[in-house]
Amino acid sequence: MIIGIGTDIVGIPRFQRHVDDPDSSLLRRIFTDQERSYCNARKSGAAACFAARFAAKESFLKALGTGLSDGISWHDMEVVNDELGKPELRLSRRAEELFRKKKGAGLFLSLSHDGGCAVAMVVLESL
């Protein structure tokens, strides 16, 4: 049974400014070391990569229905890719706890970017 759906769209230029600024703390605050390494390795596509991952985190928070309240940190949600490149959302700490509290059993993530925007959709499922 579906217990939550969230979607978010983000302007890629918003993240390009932070990719271009080595002193920007925003990327460290929102993204894990692994996420930053993955996106920065994309060179010209780094901003789109960061924007899509931010949209994924926002989409999860919308699907969960909490926003960043209730003790969830940006680092409690991490977008990783499987061996075929499929993006997955890895939860930890408070995000995982609240997901389980809602009887969450499955989490589905889709990412895309085009025309200066990145979009993500998250579907939460229970047994």
Swiss-Prot record:
Root EC class: transferase
Any Gene Ontology biological process: fatty acid biosynthetic process
Localization terms from the record: Cytoplasm
Listed InterPro entries: 4-PPantetheinyl_Trfase_dom, 4-PPantetheinyl_Trfase_dom_sf, ACPS, Ppantetheine-prot_Trfase_dom
EC number per UniProt: 2.7.8.7
Family per record: Belongs to the P-Pant transferase superfamily. AcpS family.
Designated name of the protein: Holo-[acyl-carrier-protein] synthase
Native species: Pelobacter propionicus (strain DSM 2379 / NBRC 103807 / OttBd1)
Lineage of the organism: Bacteria, Pseudomonadati, Thermodesulfobacteriota, Desulfuromonadia, Desulfuromonadales
